[in-house]
A protein has these predicted regions:
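A residue-level marker of the well-folded mature domains of exported/periplasmic proteins
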Residues: 1-140
Length: 140
């Protein structure tokens, strides 16, 4: 009910690479040229859809978006570029802290040395989009 006018036109499983996502996007846009949003489970899927949409000439950039559930410096950069339609990767769900490897190391060290540690680790889940990308994007 959040998007009563939305129609799911295709579900594609198993997209794990940028190339596979570009191929799936090509097929999607050939069979459904009016697609306005693509949701992806992982970053590579979104990056591939974004690359296809940006280069195909078949997409009205101001009317299209892709969203995912993954995080990397490249994803942050693409979301930042979407502020000026230089990317169509409009947002992502960021899982975990800013330093997951360090946090994991600290927890494991405490476990191995018999020190007390939090038994339940709740990683933060944050939606990152144009409204808060400046907090997460670090220009090189």
């Amino acid at each position: 009910n959040l998007c009563p006018k939305a129609n799911i036109v295709k579900v594609v499983d198993g997209i794990a690479t940028n190339q596979a996502a570009q191929e799936a996007a090509s097929t999607l846009f050939q069979t459904n040229p009016d697609v306005k949003v693509v949701l992806c489970f992982n970053g590579e899927g979104c990056l591939g859809v974004n690359e296809y949409a940006m280069s195909s000439g078949n997409v009205e950039k101001s009317e299209f978006a892709t969203f995912g559930a993954d995080w990397s410096d490249q994803i942050a950069e693409e979301i930042h570029k979407s502020l000026t339609d230089e990317s169509l990767y409009r947002g992502s769900v960021k899982f975990g802290s800013d330093n997951i490897p360090q946090n994991a190391y600290e927890i494991v060290t405490k476990m191995l040395t018999g020190q007390p540690y939090e038994k339940v680790q709740l990683d933060p889940i944050v939606t990152v989009d144009k409204t808060n990308i400046d907090k997460y994007y670090k220009a090189e």
